[in-house]
């Protein structure tokens, strides 16, 4: 999926939805900017295997998204402003293994998150599959430390103790001891 259009201010207003087979509820439902790791309409150059965000606002998604019979992709502009969207979708018609999983992505937002409350990234997932990661855009509204969020994974019936328990939000994103801006110390 390679969309492109003018207007960073619309990245949160353009909603990407992807439906597999005859689904009535989308497996992917996310603002376009957030799907491409550009939260709050802020440009972030990304060069990774599954996602690239290039100068000039070109978004490229290379996640494998197999389907068997039907795929429907929609883009909904929820703003009052008209825009033009350019896109390219590449696909191959081939046999899909029976155990092949469908791609899913969701958007979750709490604004503001009450101090000291648990923020759930992904909840109540059923079935087999692979969790491939999280993109998170956050802001701090106080002078307190934001990092010790302790990312926890409760898997396959865990209740009292998680299968995986991290040491802090910044560590989950490979930024041990913060992502402090060396110039502003923010």
Predicted regions and their residues:
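Beta-strand-centric surfaces of beta-sandwich/beta-rich domains
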Residues: 2-186
